[in-house]
């Protein structure tokens, strides 16, 4: 089992390491230790390190917003490598811009517009970030549909 697990991790890592470096560098642009996060295998586990600070797990270095950016970079890397556009070409992310600084939010919005994903469903409770996403997506020629879930819920509750 341990050998199979290590082989799986190695295959996954080799497949996503370049997209992860690119996407994390684009999303976490204000990171003082350099652009991009490197993934390596240590003692049978996947570890993420800053490119310029070898041996340091980024979970001990990055802020919450930067870790959110890394999570999205990992998601996009896996989708880029293993995603099948012949199937359901959709991306769903709950509050992707939460705790992310403005520069990273703009970078993420730009990156999402360049992915060619059939449908992107995002949720956020921050109006300013929703406005940013709406602007970036419309500017990229993508159609945008917004739903205020609280208003929809209140409408159904008051109608009963």
What do the PLM-derived regions correspond to, one by one?
Residues 29, 36-41:
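Short beta-strand
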Residues 13, 45-76, 97-100:
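Conserved ABC ATPase signature
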Residues 83-86, 100-106:
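Conserved ATPase-coupling elements of RecA-like P-loop NTPase cores
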Residues 64, 81-86, 112-116:
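Conserved catalytic network of the ASCE P-loop NTPase/AAA+ motor domain
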Residues 104-160:
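C-terminal lobe/lid and adjacent interdomain/linker elements of RecA-like ASCE P-loop ATPase modules
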Residues 29, 78-83:
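Conserved helix-loop functional segments at active or binding sites
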Residues 1-28, 32:
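Charged, surface-exposed helical/loop "interaction arms" that form contiguous linear patches used
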Residues 85-95:
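Catalytic Walker B motif of ABC-type/P-loop ATPase nucleotide-binding domains
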